[in-house]
Amino acid sequence: MDLGQFIIQNFHEFLTYTAFANATVGNLIRIAVGAFFIWLAIKKDFEPLLLVPIGLGIILGNIPFRADAGLEIGLYEDNSVLNIFYQGVRQGWYPPLIFLGIGAMTDFTALLANPKLMLIGASAQFGIFGAYMVALAMGFEPSQAAGIAIIGGADGPTAIFLSSKLSPNLMGAIAVCAYSYMALVPVIQPFIMRLLTTKKERVIKMKPGREVSQTERILFPIIGLLLTTFIVPSGLPLLGMLFFGNLLKESGKTTRLAKTAGTALNDIVVMLLGLTVGCSTQASEFLTFNTIKIFALGAMAFMIATASGVCFVKLMNLFLPESKKLNPLIGNAGVSAVPMAARISNNLGLEYDRHNFLLMHAMGPNVAGVIGSAVAAGALLGFLS
């Protein structure tokens, strides 16, 4: 073999290892989707902390390579770096750690000052159970239907936790769908809120809540943990970490731990979770008709949850005196997209009355929605395991 043939043969062999030789149309479509997510995050400011890691993860997971090369670089190849990171998703480690961070950052004062707001968070879970029934009717297995339905809670970590236990084969699609709808809260919810409320209802001013003592704030995570986990023990990994994080925050003696859980630890886990979830949406498994059905059911669940919260506030107002009526615009905050949904309530309220600040009122049902979605996930897990 002369030098020219040797170079040509080895160059041809080299080309077989490149992405150019192994790329499919599906890979290119998913890479474009990943780039679109990054564009939405940076250009349109749609939840950049979520969409940048997920978008880059989608691109990373769809860069093609020779599967028989034994390079140990793919997400699903044992001992690869990405596979090690992915175990946090697959085994369900990341969601409880994120709930720890959420608990350490969350102020439950608005909920404690006006406990009836918890009912709004509970009512928003109708979206989950409504979508579950529709998913069953569409031919999904009960375990798959549960994983899809939890998207209605607009809670990415809960969706990942439940789908990793009940429907791991759909986890990538469910996770991306859940985080996509979390990022699209400012697009989806305002239309539903305007549709279901009158101008008179939108300008209702709510009285400030009472002052909550430190003792109440300390007792809440302890009592909340006991009540929720005694009712739904299968929700312990999420609820336990949520209330643990909140106790660290409210005790006044573990400020350093609460700060670490709510900042550095939470940021690291969110980065790894977003990246690996994005990587898991590989074209060969993601571009299917089932994925389209999952996104459609997820949208339906999220819209039902939003509408349920708004309508439930209107129902509550029928039984409340004029001085204690609630603004229905806080009903959308019953989903657990914290604090995005509460910000939408506030922004829409200011649009109709620039002196009507609803943010703190909306945070009550918003944090109740976090608890509600975790309880709903625990109930589905316990029922279907």
Ranges and model annotations:
Residues 1-22, 28, 78, 191-220, ...:
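Intrinsically disordered, low-complexity non-transmembrane regions of multi-pass membrane transporters
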Residues 91-92, 99-105, 120-130, 134, ...:
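Alpha-helical membrane segments and immediately flanking helix-loop junctions
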Residues 169-187, 295-305, 330-333:
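Alpha-helical transmembrane segments
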Residues 225-313:
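Transmembrane helical segments that form the transport core of multi-pass membrane transport proteins
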